[in-house]
Amino acid sequence: YQMRAYGSGGANRGDDYGIPSIQMISDMCGEDVMNNGSGWYLYNYNYWGETQANIFRTDQLWTFHYRLVNNLNSVITYVDDSEGEDMDKQYIKGQALALRGWAYFDLARLYQQTYAIAKDMPGVPIYTEPTVDGTQGKPRGTLEETYQQILSDLTTAESRLEGFVRSSSYPNVFDQTVVQGVLSQVYQVMNNWAKSEEYAKKVLAVYPLTTAEEYANGFNDHLTKSWIWGIKQTEEQNMGDYSPFAMWYNGDRKCWTFAGFILSVQCVDLFDEDEIRFK
């Protein structure tokens, strides 16, 4: 299923365009971004959008992730019996497991407090087989059980993707290093600092940090060393206004989607002009 297409979460709104929109929503829910009371993301800033079941936002988040999980479950279930080389099928299954682990990791962070204080509290429903409209829904289980599934998916994917080399034209595809990066994040949330550091070092061994000079040149090249998972946009691809690139336009502070989600002058004034963050 397209992970960056308009309406991929079922909300069919200009701020419903898959993983990039969910990343924007998550940014607005954090403590380091503020909203001035306008724009769509106000409803995320005040947590209204995530906690009310009768409005578009929580339905968008829930639908996108579980629609993705269900499609991945079909791949995981049936790929072994499909035609093709065994190694190719191993890699495909590894990528599906990795993305399913990522999806449950995202759901766990959206619908429960952090693992360190909430592992015995409700997690999210876990589905590992394809479902249809009449499938009986599953209970939430505990957050610890959710993280057990996340780790199972990601560690299995890590081993299955051994030796897989992705094309630079498709940075959206999981390879082993991307899986290790997600595992580092998962262990960090679980406060398992040693494992988080171990996996972060594995990533850094393959993708060195961006230099200060490269950092100052901007973020328009998906081949920049620090970018290990992303979307390559080509001139032939055009989703019009319903795209992350239209949504991220911030040249006009009166832009209808972003009036409340733009770097303030007061924030810019905190940094010296010679500092890398200012540049």
Give the positions of each predicted feature:
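Second-shell loop/turn segments in exported
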Residues: 55-62, 83-85, 133-143, 169-170
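Aromatic-residue-lined binding/catalytic grooves and analogous aromatic/hydrophobic interfacial grooves
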Residues: 155, 176-210
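Short coil/linker segments at helix-helix boundaries
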Residues: 110-144, 148, 152
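Short coil/turn linking the two alpha-helices of tandem helical-hairpin repeats
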Residues: 108-115, 165, 189-191
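Conserved, well-structured interaction surfaces
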Residues: 37-111, 159-163
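Hydrophobic-face positions in mid-chain alpha helices that act as interaction patches
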Residues: 7-10, 14-19, 195-279
